Each structure stands twice: as structure tokens, then as C-alpha cells.
Amino acid sequence: MTVDAVVLAGGDGAVIDPSCRFKGLLPIAGKPMVQWVAEALRDAEMIREVAVVVPTAEGLGAWVDDIGKIVVSDGSFVDNVVAGVGAFRGDRRVLLTTGDIPAITPAALDDFVRQSLDTGADAVYPLVRKDDMLSEFPGSERTFVRLATGPVTGGNMMLIDPEIIMANQEIGGRIFATRKNPVAMARVIGMRFVVRLLLGRLTVVEVERKLGQLIGGTGAAVYTTHASIGADVDKPVDVVVAERVLYARSTGRAPDSQAE
């Protein structure tokens, strides 16, 4: 079974490049950042069709001719997700991903999709161990959360049943809006969960259970050794690290750890 993919390419890129009209157009190693993501999805075996959601289609470039669908939506996070999912027939799972993970590979995508489908869950979220992240992306400045099994960072994608998306627009918007405010998030997902998270006592099973409760379905979390899934570009140092990794791949050399 294959899945469809929605890439959310909007967002403010001005914090990195003031001339960037939206985040997906940020130049990384000679290409717009979202182009790296879209091309990896196009080449992945487990992806049927790709829809890239952008705030405007102006100036995207010729690369879009090789991508399935371009969806113009400049609304809220939830609005953009719904617009992207609406580009498909709704007959299979959808891989939601951000457009700011330029080092993503077809192999990483295929592995996550296969693992996710094997769980049979309605929504599946990837976890990357700290050691894997720092090994593949030396010099990376990520935020890690300590689970009972050790420090992890979350991936920038989710495999989900489109019916779950449509039924959870309100809660999805609230979680996204509070994602950087632990107190506000606690009001949405529960204080006990947040406290256990902050204390490093949460288990993966608890994460899965909470995800299922929030969406009114079944949730799962899977570990991936493909750290590119969690290597988003949010600040200038992330650009340096991503370009170093991409250059190292193209030359067959290991990336060094010195961020400039």
C-alpha cells in the first residue's frame, strides 16, 4: 500500500533570510528548501501523489512541473492541512510533513511509512534518538525531550487517516497554537502528562495513549534511525548544518561538526 503526501511549505522565513517571501523558498544548497522535500517524496516508493501547500504560487520555479499538485492556501495551520488533504480522494493514509527538512531522503520516508502502516494506528508520529541526531547532523542545535528510555526529538511529519484530520480540526489548532507554551499546552493535553514529560518519566506507551485520546482513535509512536526526519531548519545555524550534510552526501564525505 502507498500513501499520499502533503507538504506544508509556508511559514515565515524572514528570521533566516529577510528577502525570503515564505519559508519554503529559503535557498538551501542551491535549491528552494521545499524542493528538496518535494523531490524526496516524488522519488520515495511508498508515496503515490504529492501536494505542496504554499501561500502563493508566484515565483516557485520550474521544479513544480515534476510535482503532482500545488495547493495555494494562506490560512491557519489547520486551514492549510485541510486544503492539502482535500487535494486527494481520501481513500488512503496521508503523510503530513513540513517543507523545512531539506536533508530528508526517499529511504527515510519509505522506512517511516512502512513502520507506520505496520502499526495499524490512525495516527503515527516519529521519534529520533539524540545519539542518532547528533551522529547524522553534527553541530545541530535541536530541542530534546527526555522520555523514560532516553532523550529524543520529534519528527516533522505524521502519517494519519484523513478522516481523523477532518474530525479533529479544533483540537489540532489548539495543540499547534500552544506547542511552544508548556502551561497553555497543559490545559489542552492535561497537566499530568506535561509534568511527567518535563520530569522525563513518560514512556512511549503513554505518548501513544495520549495521542489516541486526543484524536478519538488509535495513536502510535515509532523510532526512526533516519535523523533527517527531525532536522528542520528554523535558524541560521540549521542552514549551515543542512548544507554541510547535503554537500557531504554529494561528495561521499562525512559531515564535520563545526557550525560557522
Describe every region a protein language model picked out:
Residues 3, 7, 31-93, 106, ...:
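Conserved N-terminal catalytic core of the sugar/cofactor nucleotidyltransferase
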Residues 210, 214-218, 240-260:
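C-terminal catalytic/acceptor-binding lobe
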